[in-house]
């Protein structure tokens, strides 16, 4: 996944973009066979909720049983890094340009929204997955579910 040259993003902004992307992406079952985002977002949310307590429990358990501190800390750090890996991946995905097959479908969905009377901001540059998430979220609110039949 390459990042477009005109949208430079630093390492820490990818986490923020990943969080925004996970909140924007519509969690619809009909999108799951085509896009991996549903699974990644679900697992990232799960990791954000459960990995910190698991890391603390693992650290305390290994120390209480007389284990060494090094492996205990390494295990806890690994558990804490899992949610960050998910957010980083989502941030990278949000700025990735759409492939040609999805790009055509993106413009079809935008056309259906405009035909329904929705005012959409013009697309600047090559659309990315964040633009797709915004468009899909709006389409699920405004259109009937038949717009997914072309997917």
Curated annotation (Swiss-Prot):
Signal peptide per UniProt: none
Disulphide bond pairs: none
Record's bilayer topology term: Multi-pass membrane protein
Main location per the UniProt record: membrane
Record InterPro entries: UPF0208
Location(s) in or outside the cell: Cell inner membrane
Keyword S-adenosyl-L-methionine among record annotations: no
Keywords of the record: Cell inner membrane, Cell membrane, Membrane, Transmembrane, Transmembrane helix
Keyword Cell membrane among record annotations: yes
Membrane-spanning intervals of the chain: 46-65, 69-91
GO CC field: plasma membrane
NCBIfam families in the cross-refs: PRK01816.1 (NF002493)
Family indicated by similarity: Belongs to the UPF0208 family.
The protein's name: UPF0208 membrane protein YfbV
Annotated source species: Escherichia fergusonii (strain ATCC 35469 / DSM 13698 / CCUG 18766 / IAM 14443 / JCM 21226 / LMG 7866 / NBRC 102419 / NCTC 12128 / CDC 0568-73)
């Amino acid at each position: 996944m390459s990042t477009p040259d005109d949208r430079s993003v630093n390492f820490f902004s990818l986490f923020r973009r990943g969080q925004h992307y996970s909140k924007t992406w519509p969690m619809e079952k009909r999108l799951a066979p085509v896009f991996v985002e549903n699974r990644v977002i679900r697992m990232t949310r799960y990791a954000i909720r459960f990995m910190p307590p698991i890391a603390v429990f693992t650290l305390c358990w290994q120390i209480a049983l007389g284990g060494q501190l090094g492996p205990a800390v390494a295990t806890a750090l690994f558990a804490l890094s899992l949610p960050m890996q998910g957010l980083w991946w989502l941030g990278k995905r949000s700025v990735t340009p759409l492939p040609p097959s999805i790009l055509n479908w993106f413009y079809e969905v935008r056309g259906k929204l405009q035909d329904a009377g929705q005012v959409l901001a013009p697309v600047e540059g090559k659309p990315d997955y964040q633009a797709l998430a915004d468009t899909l979220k709006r389409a699920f609110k405004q259109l009937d579910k038949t717009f997914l039949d072309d997917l």
